[in-house]
């Protein structure tokens, strides 16, 4: 994957996370679209790309969210690299195993994130078990659905002009 494509995926996730998601889902489903983007990149690219995109996305998210700068960057770096290493050993082609990977990556991210905050003796944000599992469930569902949509996107071909309409055709 080219650097511009990786950067655009991370920036798009950051923009959605900070602008659109708070208005669409509110506070009842905590989603981390940056983490979803990092895990997607980790499953489709190399471990080095996942490591660098996790570090960049996490530090930018820390800067925008007002937390301790670097904590989310370290957590997302560890998650991205770990998922990429697992992805090089295991081929995942079905939706449910992808959901499990997104779910497990969110749990790993939460444990590293909360562990770093507890070592820094800072007030731990969003530390209840139900909120962590809610975020893992939300990220798992969103990640699995987005992975399938992005996988099916190149198969969408435009058939041609019939009158003034363009008819899309999905090839399954």
Task: Label the predicted regions.
Residues 1-172:
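Terminal, non-globular segments
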């Amino acid at each position: 994957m080219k650097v511009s494509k990786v950067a655009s995926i991370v920036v798009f996730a950051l923009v959605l996370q900070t602008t659109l998601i708070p208005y669409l889902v509110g506070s009842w489903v905590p989603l981390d679209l940056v983490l979803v983007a990092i895990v997607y990149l980790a499953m489709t690219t190399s471990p080095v790309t996942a490591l660098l995109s996790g570090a960049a996305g996490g530090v930018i998210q820390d800067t925008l969210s007002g937390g301790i700068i670097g904590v989310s960057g370290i957590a997302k770096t560890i998650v991205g690299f770990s998922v990429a290493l697992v992805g090089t050993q295991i081929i995942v082609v079905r939706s449910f195993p992808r959901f499990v990977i997104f779910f497990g990556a969110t749990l790993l991210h939460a444990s590293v994130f909360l562990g770093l905050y507890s070592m820094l003796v800072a007030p731990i944000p969003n530390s209840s078990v139900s909120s962590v599992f809610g975020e893992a469930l939300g990220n798992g569902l969103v990640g699995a659905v987005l992975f399938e949509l992005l996988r099916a996107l190149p198969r969408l071909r435009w058939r041609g002009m019939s009158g003034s309409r363009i008819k899309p055709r999905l090839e399954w």
